[in-house]
Amino acid sequence: MGFASISWKDSVRNVSETGEFVWNLATKELAEQMNRTSLPVPDDVDEFQLAGLTAVPSKHVDVPRVLESRAAMECKVTEIVQFKNWKGEKVEGWLVLGEVVAVYIDTSLIKDGVYQTALATPILRGGDYLEVTQDRMFEMERLPGSSKPAFHGA
């Protein structure tokens, strides 16, 4: 699991100090609260409280997860990489990678043993804010001989 940051913000600083993080699924329902966590606030401000979210203890890492998030992954940091330009020069931006050590998923999002992405109404930022919805999904069969993930009943 990983996330990127355009600068050395609280998230990157915190994971570099603790070696742990929790990835919480941002959804359409939580968009405003999640957006509030990006405000530039002093270190002593509780961003959970600022955003109106509930912090709950994790089981395998010492950082909390967001109770209201319908899916979350507890992670141990494996690598923090500073971005480089095409010349190999370091630029402002970071990629944090971690091994997932625990997963929480709202069971209503699982059908026939498979996580139903669109049911969670996840959002992402890819130049702009985007939402994954059921009407934008499509079916695609894997080609003969292509590898299938072992966790998907390959």
Question: Where does each model-flagged region fall?
Answer:
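Basic, polyanion-binding surface patches
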Residues: 1-154
